[in-house]
Amino acid sequence: MIASPLFAISPIDGRYSSKVIKLRNIFSEYAFLKFRVTIELLWLKKISLLQEFKIVYNKDVLNCLDRIIDNFSKKDALEIKILEKKTNHDVKSIEYFLQKKIFKCLGNHDILGLVHFGCTSEDINNLAYALMLKVSRRDIILPLWNKIIFEIKKIALLHHNVPMLSRTHGQPATPSTIGKELINFAYRLERQLKQFKNIEILGKINGSTGNYNALHFSHSSVDWHKISQEFVTSLGLFWNPYTTQIEPHDFISEFFSCLARVNTILINFNRDIWGYISLQYFNQTPKLDEIGSSVMPHKINPIDFENSEGNLGLSNAIISHLIEKLPISRWQRDLSDSTVLRNVGTVIAYSIIAYDSIILGLKKLKVNTSRLLQDLNHHWEILAEPIQTVMRKYGINDTYNELKNITRGKRVTSDIILKYVNSLKIPRNEKEKLLQLTPENYLGLSSKLVKIFNNSSELK
């Protein structure tokens, strides 16, 4: 086995391996096996305690099962994989492995016959995937989203009143502030974050076609519907009482749809920041030993935002197939979801790489105030909007077309605007307000909106 990232086929385990180390404990083959071993043994504990099974359940049994979970190792995982080569069935191999382990510490105990009792493979697998997604959301995804929002808000609050020329259709438009334009993204992200946190992660354990057939036939006096609910919810999951052989994966589609929406918002963010860097509204702090180009020594490229955009695109491309394919299964089940589900870690890995790049890029940004003011002062034509609005307020007709003729497609200076304002027949106080107006201070509520958002935001 070649362990070096140099020989990895995927850049996830190669070039970017250091960025996704934490995911290996959730989505690797080893982790998947450990989750399934844990679920098998927790189910074994659950049913062996039922009085209908008449199992002698003592401290030795409990300690044996707990030790198998707590001490699960790479050696154990490899043993399961060796068994799988013979059986060509991953979950049956886990069952044989557990029977062997339990026999070693308890001998020929009655509990051996209850390993994987009344289960179908999907009873174990769906719960494993549910836990994997639950843990990744709690420990990996949400903390990174919070960090991105925090970094965006930090820059926004620091520059809440720094004026910036807006651009609609790529052309000069009504000014905003650096802070307000960043807060737009923070608001969008927070909204998705709230939805993501509230997505119910479901699980089921109800047999080969979702009807408890084997369980009910063997022990009809047991309320298996209730036992199923108790077991699933004990794992910190929501119970799905109505399924075929498989949990239908609707929640996984919801989970990744929300992830894709966040990724799409961040692609938008990356492109906007890339553009602002190109306009020199932001500068990037150079690192002494870094090189921007193999031939152009002066270059400081927006590589973090470009890297993030590319990896978010890869993640969303796979998500597109996940959310379309997973909720569809032929009749009571087909196996086409199995290979797709094995790629959920890949999806999240590409996203994590992208999130790290955004955070790195944000920490390098410096607002270039002088360039922002220079751009604003080059576009006095944007004041046509407030001037014509005030004129309309006082019933002056055809103001829009009059200002259109003066400003549209022309280089407009402060002198042209001031001369026009002085010619207006409006109250003196209104004229004074217009004469004091500049592209730099025509900001509406931009700065205030940043503070309002910060005060109402749940993420501090």
From Swiss-Prot:
Pfam families: ASL_C, Lyase_1. GO terms for cellular component: cytosol. It catalyses: N(6)-(1,2-dicarboxyethyl)-AMP = fumarate + AMP; (2S)-2-[5-amino-1-(5-phospho-beta-D-ribosyl)imidazole-4-carboxamido]succinate = 5-amino-1-(5-phospho-beta-D-ribosyl)imidazole-4-carboxamide + fumarate. CDD domains: PurB (cd01598). Its EC number is 4.3.2.2. GO terms for molecular function: (S)-2-(5-amino-1-(5-phospho-D-ribosyl)imidazole-4-carboxamido) succinate lyase (fumarate-forming) activity; N6-(1,2-dicarboxyethyl)AMP AMP-lyase (fumarate-forming) activity. Pathway: Purine metabolism; AMP biosynthesis via de novo pathway; AMP from IMP: step 2/2; Purine metabolism; IMP biosynthesis via de novo pathway; 5-amino-1-(5-phospho-D-ribosyl)imidazole-4-carboxamide from 5-amino-1-(5-phospho-D-ribosyl)imidazole-4-carboxylate: step 2/2. N(6)-(1,2-dicarboxyethyl)-AMP binds at residues 15-16, 88-90, 120-121, 245, 294, 299-301, 307, 333, 338-342. Transmembrane segments: none annotated. InterPro entries: Fumarase/histidase_N, Fumarate_lyase_CS, Fumarate_lyase_fam, Fumarate_lyase_N, L-Aspartase-like, Pur_lyase, PurB_bact, PurB_C. The keyword Lyase applies. Catalyzes two reactions in de novo purine nucleotide biosynthesis. Catalyzes the breakdown of 5-aminoimidazole- (N-succinylocarboxamide) ribotide (SAICAR or 2-[5-amino-1-(5-phospho-beta-D-ribosyl)imidazole-4-carboxamido]succinate) to 5-aminoimidazole-4-carboxamide ribotide (AICAR or 5-amino-1-(5-phospho-beta-D-ribosyl)imidazole-4-carboxamide) and fumarate, and of adenylosuccinate (ADS or N(6)-(1,2-dicarboxyethyl)-AMP) to adenosine monophosphate (AMP) and fumarate. Homotetramer. Residues from neighboring subunits contribute catalytic and substrate-binding residues to each active site. This is Adenylosuccinate lyase. The gene is purB.
